[in-house]
Curated annotation (Swiss-Prot):
Chief location bin: cytoplasm
GO biological process, one term: negative regulation of DNA-templated transcription
Protein known as: Alanine--tRNA ligase
Gene designation: alaS
Gene Ontology cellular component list: cytosol
């Protein structure tokens, strides 16, 4: 029985032997395609090839593409764990022809692979074709010898594929496997086709038409092939099981989950183990491709997946975080096919652990609230949207997690009510990932590229070059010429200007034409490898002009230093913090460097000092930087660090900086990078971290300066220290101790002042007699307006007044500071059933023009912007007490 890994290899090797380029899986985050949340099909990385926007590097290709369907239009999340074939992560095996072979060869390849290499019984296979695609039906008869009853014609769009309202499209032919008559279900096209007997295992798409805007379909001059076979589905067939979760990969993951939880994967507990196994896979691969859990966009989808699995771990009784302990099993199963899993294993484990620890803090309380809210509901009942929103807002329960939690009891959630609460509160904003495709300008650049070819970048060796204007784009449209005063995008045949990529800002400078210098304010990449200059024209410019392009050399020098320093920081973070650190982003320009990385908490002063010391030690080595061109896989196997989610071409530039501080003969930093860098580490001169902060859950950011900017920063810091020393009349070395003493003295004085205010407040104040409480409809009330007493002091004053109410009562205080009012209400225990401090405080705040108050039945506080209405607030409380 072949393993999942063996099946994948057999597929790729078959097509590799048939002159297909074996293409590694693209990252799950789509490259240069904002219209997609995640890669969700095997053809996505080839989208621009099929549309004609890019030239295919090979006429034939094959791949096993990582895919995620857990958000947006394609969302399988709710079904995962409860069905035999739904997954959030799956692998799509595919073979592709870009204008090379067509239907006959595609069908021949499919039939040969399935019946010869996969050894599937021929009598177990049947196919569907689009009802008008007689050509495909005839080919199935000719090649496979299928009878008419095993070639089913389908008239619906299930067997006609299109990319959108316009673009390439064509009929499909789907191949089905018959599990046997002991499984319920009918063949495709029959009334009971949704049964599990006949399972689709391969879809062949014949792209032979182009859909025009007016509704017409025209034949493509070079039709193409796009096929997709779910690896998990074909593995189930070949391993003789009917359920994807019974294949070898999932059996190993579920066995590990069973071992760690001590709960068998049977009965009501089986879906939980399946959810954990599936979600571990999608979470780990998303983390490996650079996605981090957050509250918006892709990061929020990842967090939803992780938390759904973590709730199921909670249901299994796992007392400690579980997911991170399962990750090594996944890496052992899939790390050979996907080396990025192995490279990111430490980071995956750490992120899973941190996220589960954070969620477990609120998970138990949230489940308690959910149990309480659903206690009176039976099957068919509906959980109100307000409670679902509270679970989301307060306890971090995504809506689908709440829906999943109540589904076993037959309870649904009022999603409309949830949406109303979400809209009202507006506490979170999720990015709208639905896009409309490429802009007209971007499409124009693809057309220009077909005529011009890629830009010849010579900026590694020089900052000035002569070039020819190949294209000018004004307001998104190509033009032949432009006049002074226009802001245009200019393409040259060769340039020394670096275009923004890899976190390095685009170069600025000047372009000289006809003796006039025009300012270049930015340089960006278009259509993959066109270096486009944003130019503020000071004179006329036309296509074909010869120009001199000069980079701002001073800015390029500092940018180089900052970029090289970022590489050294990356290496230093690994040494100081550990191998879990992964780069999450960077921005380097002529002013400073910013580096984002995965780590669970703030850096200590000692860690920051050690990072600075390492980087400056490598700078002082003053050894030459080394660059080398090689294939991406060769570079990674040689130890170069590749950035997750970065798209690399057939050849990459490998940068080596410095010598190891601990191992003789080893380099300090080796990374794949196409940016501009220093010639020697000593050119960086000096490195200084100026800030360190968190920017997202599990992501920290370092900002730093190099060279002259770092020197000026240190001089400024020294100047501040000297000024303080002069002010305190003490040596610089003793300034910190002097400041600590002053801070301690101030805190002591503040405590004394607060106590004095409290004692003064207890002696009187407007709004009531200082001698004791007043009677309001039988309730004792102490009401005061206290000038100069803030919220912190009010609590202590309220507690003291409360002690005076020996027979029960209410304390209502309004503190006035800086024209604003702070309201504090305290209710004795014997009256909380009758009066709520929270309700009384809210009434006072609203009467004073505020929004509301927070607290409990015995104590509450709130604030209002207008202190002149303090008495109105107390009057509102009196009215509430009087009923």
């Amino acid at each position: 029985m072949p393993s999942l890994n063996e099946i994948r290899s057999t597929f790729l090797n078959y097509f590799g032997a048939a002159d297909h380029a074996i293409v590694p899986s693209a990252p799950l985050v789509p490259q240069n395609d904002p219209t997609l949340l995640f890669v969700n099909a095997g053809m996505v990385p080839f989208k621009n090839v099929f549309t004609g926007a890019e030239t295919p590097p090979h006429p034939r290709a094959t791949s096993s593409q990582k895919c995620v369907r857990a958000g947006g239009k394609h969302n399988d999340l709710d079904n995962v764990g409860y069905t035999a074939r739904h997954h959030t992560f799956f692998e799509m095996l595919g073979n592709f022809s870009f204008g090379d072979y067509f239907k006959e060869q595609a069908i021949t390849h499919a039939w040969t692979l399935l019946t010869r290499d996969f050894a599937l019984p021929k009598d177990k296979l049947l196919v569907t074709v689009y009802h008008t695609d007689t050509e495909a039906a005839d080919l199935w008869k000719k090649i496979a010898g299928l009878s008419d009853d095993r070639i089913i014609r389908i008239a619906t769009n299930d067997n006609f594929w299109s990319m959108g309202d316009t673009g390439p499209c064509g009929p499909c032919s789907e191949i089905f496997f018959d599990h046997g008559d002991h499984i319920p279900g009918g063949p495709p096209g029959s009334p009971d086709e949704d049964g599990d007997r006949f399972i689709e295992i391969w879809n062949l798409v014949f792209m032979q038409f182009e859909q025009m805007a007016g509704g017409e379909r025209v034949s493509l001059p070079k039709p193409s092939i796009d096929t997709g076979m779910g690896l998990e589905r074909i593995a189930a067939v070949m391993q003789g099981v009917h359920d994807n979760y019974d294949i070898d990969l999932f059996k190993a993951l579920i066995a590990a989950s069973v071992e760690l939880t001590g709960v068998r994967a049977e009965g009501a507990q089986a879906p939980s183990h399946r959810v954990i196994a599936d979600h571990l896979r999608s979470s780990s691969f998303l983390l490996a491709d650079g996605v981090t859990p957050s509250n918006e966009g892709r990061g929020y989808v990842l967090r939803r997946i992780m938390r759904r699995a973590m709730r199921h771990a909670y249901l299994l009784g796992a007392n400690e975080p579980l997911m991170h302990r399962l990750a090594p099993t996944l890496v052992a199963q899939m790390g050979q096919a996907y080396p990025e899993l192995r490279r990111a294993e430490a980071s995956i484990v750490e992120t899973l652990r941190q996220e589960e620890e954070r969620f477990r803090v609120t998970l138990g309380r949230g489940m308690g609230l959910l149990d309480e809210a659903t206690a009176g509901l039976s099957a068919g009942g509906v959980l109100d949207g307000e409670t679902a929103f509270k679970l989301y807002d307060t306890y971090g329960f995504p809506l689908d997690l709440t829906q999943d939690a109540v589904r076993a009891r037959g309870i649904t959630v009022d999603t409309d009510g949830f949406d109303v609460a979400m809209d009202r509160q507006r506490t979170m904003a999720r990015a709208n990932w639905a896009g409309s495709g490429q802009t007209g300008a971007a499409a124009a650049w693809f057309g220009i590229k077909e005529q011009s070819g890629p830009t010849n970048f010579v900026g590694y060796d020089t900052t000035e070059t002569t070039g020819t204007v190949k294209a000018i784009v004004l307001d998104g449209a190509p033009v032949e010429a432009a006049q002074a005063g226009a802001s245009v995008d200019v393409l040259l045949d060769r340039t020394s200007f670096y275009a923004e990529s890899g976190g390095q800002a685009g170069d600025t400078g000047v372009i000289e034409a006809h003796g006039v210098e025009s300012r270049v304010t930015d340089t960006q990449k278009q259509a993959g490898d066109l270096y486009v200059h944003r130019v503020e024209l000071a004179g006329p410019l036309k296509v074909g002009d010869s120009v001199v392009a000069s980079v701002d050399a001073a800015r390029r020098t500092t940018t180089r230093a900052n970029h090289s320093a970022a590489h050294l920081v990356h290496a230093a973070l690994h040494h100081v913090l550990g191998p879990h650190v992964a780069q999450k982003g960077q921005m380097v320009d002529g002013d400073r460097m910013r580096f984002d990385f995965s780590h669970g908490g703030p850096l200590t002063a000692d860690e920051i000092e050690r990072i600075e010391a390492e980087v400056n030690a490598v700078i002082r080595q003053n050894v030459p930087a080394q660059t080398k061109e090689m294939a991406p896989q060769e570079a990674i196997e040689a130890g170069a660090v590749a950035l997750f989610g970065e798209k690399y071409g057939d050849s990459v530039r490998v940068l080596t900086l410095g010598e190891s501080l601990t191992e003789t003969g080893k380099a300090y930093s080796v990374e794949l990078c196409g940016g501009t860098h220093v010639a020697r580490t000593g050119d960086i001169a000096l490195f200084k971290i100026v800030s360190e902060q968190g920017v997202a859950s599990g992501v920290r950011r370092i900002e730093a300066l190099t060279g002259e900017a770092a020197r000026r920063f240190l001089l400024d810091q020294a100047g501040v220290a000297k000024a303080l020393a002069d002010q305190f009349k003490t040596p610089v070395a003793e300034v910190l101790a002097r400041v600590d003493a002053l801070v301690a003295e101030r805190k002591a004085l503040e405590r004394q002042l607060a106590e004095a205010k409290k004692q003064l407040a207890l002696g009187g104040g407007s709004g009531g007699a200082a001698s004791g409480p007043e009677d309001v409809a039988g309730t004792a009330l102490i009401a005061r307006v206290l000038d100069g007493v803030g919220g912190k002091e009010l609590r202590g004053v309220a507690e003291e007044f409360k002690k005076q109410l020996t027979n029960g009562g209410v304390v209502a205080l309004v503190g006035v500071t800086d024209g604003k009012a702070a309201v504090t209400v305290a209710v004795t225990a014997d009256l909380t059933a009758k009066f709520s401090a929270a309700d009384l405080a809210k009434a006072a705040v609203i009467a004073m023009g505020g929004q509301g108050a927070g607290g409990k039945a015995d104590f509450a506080q709130g604030g209002a912007p207008d202190a002149t209405k303090a008495q109105a607030g107390l009057d509102a409380i009196k009215a509430a007490l009087a009923g």
